[in-house]
Amino acid sequence: MRYLGLDLGRARIGLALADDVLRTARPLSVVRHRTREADLASIAATLREWEVGTAVVGLPLNMDGSEGASARYARAFAEELARATGVPVELFDERLSTFEAESRLREQGFSARELRGRVDAEAAAVILQGWLDGRHA
């Protein structure tokens, strides 16, 4: 089975892919926010193209574990994605995923300017890998 990780940023949605064989998430692409309908259609196309069985949406909890506006948005988006596609959608705590993604990319030698186009997909990979690790622990 394949899995798609999603990092819902303010301007972009990062996507990452993994499967049961390798159990290693890798950055896939970035979707620039347009409208909710266009975003859902783009993600639905990716789910079909890669024959994804489960999507994992990052849940941006506050550091104390409480939910704010961003977490409520992620929950609503996940529910809408599941309804629109019929693909099961799970939520996963994404605290510090962007920080970890930026650190990984800097270690690989990317400049601050180059991070902008890559960090969302890398953060989606961090989220998906965390979910996979927890699932297979």
From Swiss-Prot:
EC number of this enzyme: 3.1.-.-
Annotated localization: Cytoplasm
A family per Pfam: RuvX
Listed name of the protein: Putative pre-16S rRNA nuclease
Highest taxon listed in the record's lineage: Bacteria
Source organism (scientific name): Anaeromyxobacter sp. (strain Fw109-5)
UniProtKB keywords: Cytoplasm, Hydrolase, Nuclease, Ribosome biogenesis
HAMAP family for the chain: Nuclease_YqgF
Function per UniProt: Could be a nuclease involved in processing of the 5'-end of pre-16S rRNA.
